[in-house]
Each structure stands twice: as C-alpha cells, then as structure tokens.
Amino acid sequence: MEGQTFKKKERLRLKRNFKNVFEKGGRLIDNNFVIIYVPNTMDYNRIAVIVNRKFGNAVVRNLIKRYIREIYRTNKTFFPLGYDFVFIPRKELSKNFKGIDYSQIKNQILKLVRKLEA
C-alpha cells in the first residue's frame, strides 16, 4: 500500500506547465481518451485531468476525474517516471459512460500508457 498516495506535488497546476505540455507534448490517442505527455526534470510524475463541459453534467465530469486520479494513484508503477501527463476524456466516452465501469476505463488508460513505454 505504500506509495499509493496522490500528493500535492504530483498535481500539474501552473499555467506555464500546462502550456509546456500542450506545446511540446506527445499524444496517445484512442476512442475514449487523449493523453498528452512531456518529460519533466523531476523524479516523479505530475498529472492533470481536463474534462470539457460538453462531457456531461458536473456529477459525471467529477466522477470521471476521480476515476482517472484513482487509476493513476493505484497504478503508479505502470507509469514511467519523470513525465507530466494531461488526461482528456473524449466525447465518445460521455455517450457510453453509463455503460462503462471503472475496470474498463482502467484497462483503456493502462493500455495507452504501455504504448508510451514501447
């Protein structure tokens, strides 16, 4: 269980950091997610989740953000160290969100992250 925390330093918060990720970052894309990543100079990862207002109501948007943060928190070992990640759920996911459970979302995200390591 040790190491399964989501510390404040692991959050991507500053505008200049977001700008760096969007300008210089690579993209991992599938039907439901876009993950934008860029190497950072730290020995840990930082993440952010961006959910468009068109994704659904506030309850659904917050739920998907909690899911993604929890997937990251419990599966840190699958993420290569020293990266900034921005997770963006796509509109396709919002259409099917009620029919998709946590484990399916987890599998999709981890599958995308494995592409980064390859």
Swiss-Prot record:
* Coiled-coil parts of chain: none
Protein's GO biological process: tRNA 5'-leader removal
**Catalysis performed (reactions):** Endonucleolytic cleavage of RNA, removing 5'-extranucleotides from tRNA precursor
Leading EC class: hydrolase
Q: Name one GO molecular function term.
A: 3'-tRNA processing endoribonuclease activity
Tell me, how does this one assemble? Answer: Consists of a catalytic RNA component (M1 or rnpB) and a protein subunit.
Protein family membership: Belongs to the RnpA family.
Query: What's the protein here called?
Result: Ribonuclease P protein component
Native species of this protein? Petrotoga mobilis (strain DSM 10674 / SJ95)
